[in-house]
């Protein structure tokens, strides 16, 4: 008998009887080699044979009840993975299936990129830190900081939520200066990027040597979003300092979530050599309060200005082999409850002025 883990063995022919040689072998054991010139090239399951003992010679034989063929139940080296096969491609996120593959060929370590380090800061004098009394009517709980932190962590970033900074220029500048010295790859703030008197982020980051790449884009929600590179001017060797990516997101929670999904996360994918997400496609369902009829099979679901890209929370469903999606009707950049009941975003492209039931739309996962 040959068991799994045994060294390969050589089997000699039975010269006395002249009968073909067979060997009992366990799953995972190496096939034996024959010194008689006849290759042992087939394995028959134990369930498909009967062992017969010759009472005269005490020799054991097997009787096979099912047809056998060459290479049956035999696994050859290289029949699964071959030399030069790619197990994990550059830019892929390592998942358990990759671990199964690399471990099976004896690889115990693989080179990976480090997680991007991200600092998250909420701005707003009206915000309450977590755990404080919510009874004052002029204060609200900070929703953006925890949401941004949780989403970024789920997407593979190493995130530090650094708290709330009030709407005052000097404390805000000091806080960002301190964060810049800690070597983060990306800094994200929420709030204070629009056009109000206390929207201080654009002016403050310019005082910190920021190179603003864009501020205010043609998208809804999230129009005020800002992206900049902040140069570290503290280098003492005359060489250019490192640049830190900075995203200023709007304060309205759903607008902040949209900018995170369609501005920040694509940038993090770029840092990690990953491909941007491609949209899936789904058929748009009519609203619950609209009844289709023979006279109006494809009612208008929603209308748009058409001068910018619009991202709307939606609920995707599968039905009869087709992916269908329902637009969340009760939407507002500042209302969180409708967002809670969504699981995807619909991208309404610039130039589209209306969507009708039955239209095929682009959808993206919520994060």
Task: Label each PLM-derived region with a short phrase.
Residues 1-108:
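Phosphate-interaction motifs
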Residues 73-189, 194:
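Phosphate-binding glycine-rich loops and their immediate beta-loop-alpha structural context
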